[in-house]
Amino acid sequence: MSEPSDVITPTETNSVWAERTGTRRYLAHNARGAEVAVGMGPGEFTPGELLKVALATCNTLSADHRLAKALGEDFDANVICATLKNEEEERYSDFDVQIVADLTALDPDQLAVLTERVRRAIDRGCTVGHTLDKGAATRLHLLDDEG
């Protein structure tokens, strides 16, 4: 564990928190009032599923303006994040993000241009993707709530 001086001070913009609601069950919060149930049971996301949804939606949020310009402001889309897991190391080895939308109105050249623009938008704006690509240091601090 790190020394207390290494603790990043939580703020509304750099942190989320979760409170324990039962055995292996937490309710996660952000400063904007959103909540998500985290656990292994019905109606709950596992931490791994949250990581997948974070990457998937980071991609689509980063590219939304490009997709809307090509497909129309009210376009319908779904995004899927599938993974391969290295069971021995208890980690995901590969992430595959699939954006699914009606692309039939685009000819092959338009589709190629849109694909490149979507990739560039994601490369510019997806913090979750950048973090997974480059890695990030993680630290654990066990803190006394009375101190």
Task: Give the label of every model feature segment.
Residues M1-V53, L61-G147:
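Extended beta-strand/beta-hairpin segments
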